[in-house]
């Protein structure tokens, strides 16, 4: 291989797209979470890989939104006319700081307009970095942008809620969120419950209280094994996600 060509190959970065199913309590498919990771790619691109051309910090999110639309449309086109509709809840993981970008907000609204025509629902899943780290102007911008998304029919999820700490301070406002994803591995939930029945009771009361005070739906996230599955089913969760139910797949 010529040196110049070899350098180009080594400098290639590609996005790897992943999808994992989210189930209802009755084990029916509710939706899926889709995300991407950038990786240095030194071989020809295979399924699930896409060359990343831009060094823009939010380029990954733009590519994920494009992939979601293409994936949703291809599933609909491939499905027989008499088959049940594909799960219409499409969660996209992103940082809170991404909500500061007006262009990305427009891109999400445009994506939702396309998906809505095919009965699909975009759900940005905002990670649990503390809202307290933003200044007042940034907080107002994030809140305004969330309202813009919700005005266009986009539901919002909070990703990474930890039952072992006061994660509610990171939520900005309960009224802004439609879903809260509870990470059951963050606090070693099964070990904490085994060591303290009081921790289980407090966790149960915490979720029950938030459900009573709002219309939020809760997702038990990262249910990786049977012990966590058993505990999750004994809590007031609406939906379930993790390797116990389905592997993460390349798309």
PLM features: what roles do these ranges have?
Residues 112, 142-153, 204-215:
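Surface-exposed amphipathic alpha-helices with a cationic face
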